[in-house]
From Swiss-Prot:
This is 2,3-bisphosphoglycerate-independent phosphoglycerate mutase. Monomer. The keyword Metal-binding applies. Keywords: Glycolysis, Isomerase, Manganese, Metal-binding. CDD domains: iPGM. Substrate binds at residues 125, 155-156, 187, 193, 259-262, 332. One of its GO terms (cellular component) is cytosol. Mn(2+) 2 binds at residues 14, 64, 440-441. It comes from Aeromonas salmonicida (strain A449). The keyword Acetylation does not apply. Binds 2 manganese ions per subunit.
Length: 509
């Protein structure tokens, strides 16, 4: 009989940053006896999860996709935001083959160009500068009918901040003498990632048929009406703007979000021939271009295909003959699998995956503990099974509840995670396993935007904790997320592949 394995577990507490400011800080306000004890009694430090350290522009807040890609890669991975922004600046963007092909086809046939995406300066799922660049490109290549279908953010930026973006787009349309807003809807509907197809359908029907709950003559008027209905940007209901601009056969549709997880569902509604999420009233034959590859099995043109990452942690562990488990709730399952593996959808040899359904509630402040207890039940069972050399687990609570802006709920979310961390370390102590506890980016430690006085629902660029529950060790300061994979490999007594440029942060005594 084979010897039971003593796993090294990586616990990622999503959206759990560190701030010296105590006010409006859900992490500090929460009662976290387990994490307090672990930070006191074991080796701990702070590491960076934002800006240049994760391949984003200087000062740009981190996010879950970027964080998990960097953790899994063991090197700084330059992000699509940085890559596309640079190409717009250099002019290369305007020569992009797939974008040009879709635009030219529409222009030749006298068809419309539809552009959809998250209108936001947030830089997490999209950047409005990219969308503006796309509108300029369409105009330069001779498109006469340019329609922008705006998804509103209010999550990675203040909850009511879309008006300044609207004004910038209106100024662009005026300067070009062409183009306009055709529709507006909150990201809550258009960018679902949890198979809530009733939400997605509202965005789909709005864009394809001009069918919305509300109509307005301008985007500013649409937003003012939404605010009068007490809808923040994220939750703005389907609104048609101006005359209906339904999508027709032969039109071009370009999706300007660069982050995959919240772009997949709406994309599948447009491009999958065997789509079953909801009954589509209209299925126009469009020249659909996704800005980046949202999933390997989505068969449509892609402006910026992925650049392959060789020897990510998952791939390297498989090559070393090690077993691994990836486990999280629905909300962060893609992050511990697809993103952690550098955009690789399939499992490596010896890699198991376990998903726990996130609760079906409208917003997670209504159930801040989410499914953390069930997730921990499965994680503890996996630790005690003796089957795995390493386990990667994500607790979504700090991030998902932090995004709601509800302080008391975020405090409860942090307390729920702390309770679970206590259970995990207790199970590891029983089997002689070890644990690294960290986060991918900040969020819950800042719940009020002091400048606007609004709830702070976005991520932060603050550092995140790193605690090593294991042997006695000294820590190298100044670490970042890309140092975690080399740290894990070193603790497991394994070589670090040359592609990983991160450094091991724990030096065993």
């Amino acid at each position: 009989m084979s010897t039971a394995k003593k796993p090294l577990v990586l616990v990622i507490m999503d959206g759990w940053g560190y701030s010296t400011k105590q006010e409006h800080n859900a992490v500090a306000a929460a009662k976290t006896p387990n994490l307090d004890r672990l930070a006191r009694d074991y080796t701990s430090t702070l590491i960076s999860g934002s800006g240049l350290d994760v391949g984003l522009p200087d000062g740009q807040m981190g996010n879950s996709e970027v964080g998990h890609v960097n953790i899994g890669a063991g090197r700084i991975v330059y992000q699509e935001l940085t890559r596309i922004s640079k190409e717009i600046k250099d002019g290369d963007f305007f020569q992009n083959v797939e974008l040009a092909k879709a635009l030219d086809s529409a222009v030749t046939k006298g068809k419309a160009v539809h552009i959809m995406g998250l209108m936001s300066p947030g830089g997490v799922h999209s950047h409005e500068e990219h969308i503006m660049g796309m509108i300029e490109m369409a105009a330069k290549r001779g498109a006469e009918q340019i329609y922008f279908h705006a998804f509103l953010d209010g999550r990675d930026v203040p909850p009511r901040s879309a008006q300044s973006s609207i004004e910038q787009f209106d100024a662009l349309f005026a300067r070009l003498g062409k183009g306009r807003f055709a529709s507006m809807i909150g990201r809550y509907f258009a960018m679902d990632r949890d198979n809530r197809w009733d939400r997605v359908q509202q965005a789909y029907d709005l864009m394809t048929q001009g069918k919305g709950e509300f109509t307005a003559d301008s985007a500013s008027e649409a937003l003012a009406a939404a605010y009068a209905r007490d809808e923040n940007d994220e939750f703005v209901k389907a609104t048609r703007i101006g005359a209906a601009a339904p999508m027709q056969d032969g039109d071009a549709l370009i999706f300007m979000n660069f982050r995959a997880d919240r772009a997949r569902e709406i994309t599948r509604a447009f491009v999958d021939s065997d789509f079953t999420g909801f009954a589509r009233a209209a299925t126009p034959a469009l020249n659909f271009v996704m800005l980046t590859e949202y999933a390997a099995d989505i068969k449509t043109a892609c402006a910026y295909p992925p650049t392959a990452l060789v020897n990510t942690l998952g791939e390297w562990l498989a090559k070393q003959g090690k077993t691994q488990l990836r486990i999280s709730e629905t909300e962060k399952y893609a992050h511990v699998t697809f993103f952690f593996n550098g955009g690789e959808e399939s499992c490596f040899t010896g890699e198991d995956r376990e998903i726990v359904a996130s609760p079906k509630v409208a917003t997670y402040d209504l159930q801040p503990e989410m499914s953390s207890e069930e997730l921990t039940d499965k994680l503890v069972a996996a630790i005690k099974s003796g089957k795995y050399d390493t386990i990667i687990c994500n607790y979504p609570n700090g991030d998902m509840v932090g995004h709601t802006g509800v302080f008391d709920a975020a405090v409860k979310a942090c307390e729920a995670v702390d309770h679970c961390v206590g259970r995990v370390t207790e199970a590891l102590a029983e089997v002689g396993g070890e644990c690294l506890i960290t986060a991918d980016h900040g969020n819950a430690e800042k719940m009020l935007d002091e400048e606007t006085g609004q709830a702070h629902t976005a991520h932060t660029n603050l550092p995140v904790p790193l605690i090593y529950f294991g042997r006695k060790a000294e820590v190298l300061e100044g670490g970042k997320l890309s140092d975690l994979a080399p740290t894990m490999l070193t603790l497991m007594g394994l070589p670090v592949p040359p592609e990983m440029t991160g450094k091991p942060l724990m030096i065993l005594k």
